[in-house]
Amino acid sequence: MNVTVLTKPDCVQCDFTKTHFDKHGIEYDVVDITVDADARQKAIDLGYFSAPVVIVEADGQVAHWSGFKPDRIKALGAEAGEQQ
């Protein structure tokens, strides 16, 4: 499973999202959309205009959402635990 969190500086929901991923032992990459134009465009192409945007690639499928979603992060943590 590959997880990418598109973030921006001074983003409380971004910080909560990263903290929750850490809490559930999920590894993720962080990309700052204020300095990476391609990442910013990817978020826009997915239909999002606010951070964080989380992109999860697993088993050939891609899931994504915007905002702090602790229930989805917890479910990913449980799923990752099953795969180990």
Where are each of the predicted segments found?
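Structural micro-motif
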Residues: 46-55
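Local sequence-structure signature of Cys/Sec-based thiol-disulfide redox active-site neighborhoods
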Residues: 1-24
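Short polar/charged helix/loop
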Residues: 23, 38-42
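Short amphipathic alpha-helix with an adjacent loop that forms part of the alpha/beta core around
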Residues: 41-46, 75-79
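Non-catalytic, surface beta->alpha helical segment in thiol-disulfide oxidoreductase systems
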Residues: 58-83
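Acidic/polar helix N-cap motif
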Residues: 35-36, 69
